[in-house]
Amino acid sequence: MQMLNSQTILNSEEETKNFAKAFAATLKPNNIVLLNGDLGVGKTFFCREIIKYFCGENTSIISPTFNLLQTYKTPHFTIYHCDLYRLKSPEEIYELGLEEALSGNLTLIEWSEIIKHLLPTPLIEVNLKLLDDDKRLCNITNEY
């Protein structure tokens, strides 16, 4: 399934789950995925489905909103899930150990705008937009 540089309308929560898992199947270590969109649009939900794809459906997934970073081990790499909503300056990211996350691991970053210019390329960007209560527009691009 071609996902990079694509635009898809997701009509339900179930469709979003399935799409996120299909997207996860295209990911590998060293990928950096930036998730953007308004508050409550489903960035964390999308990340949860990616993490479940690699770690199993029963994995306990905690939103990183308050501590900024959560890690999840897979047999071959670690998934770093960051939520930078509360970040005040780009320099704060170094205190989290994000540099380690970027080498050989899968990194998912919500609210990435504040540090995007500091990240190595290529980057995969997932932009979510609310169309109505259940519908989302998902635009995925690969930036070099």
Swiss-Prot record:
One GO BP: tRNA threonylcarbamoyladenosine modification
Subcellular location, principal: cytoplasm
SUPFAM superfamilies, sorted: P-loop containing nucleoside triphosphate hydrolases
Residues bound to Mg(2+): 44, 110
GO cellular component terms attached to this protein's record: cytoplasm
Keyword Metal-binding: yes
Swiss-Prot/TrEMBL keywords: ATP-binding, Cytoplasm, Magnesium, Metal-binding, Nucleotide-binding, tRNA processing
Residues binding ATP, per UniProt: 13, 40-45, 133
Compartments where located: Cytoplasm
Origin superkingdom: Bacteria
Gene Ontology MF, one: metal ion binding
Key word Transport present: no
Protein's job: Required for the formation of a threonylcarbamoyl group on adenosine at position 37 (t(6)A37) in tRNAs that read codons beginning with adenine. Is involved in the transfer of the threonylcarbamoyl moiety of threonylcarbamoyl-AMP (TC-AMP) to the N6 group of A37, together with TsaD and TsaB. TsaE seems to play an indirect role in the t(6)A biosynthesis pathway, possibly in regulating the core enzymatic function of TsaD.
Recorded family membership: Belongs to the TsaE family.
Record-given protein name: tRNA threonylcarbamoyladenosine biosynthesis protein TsaE
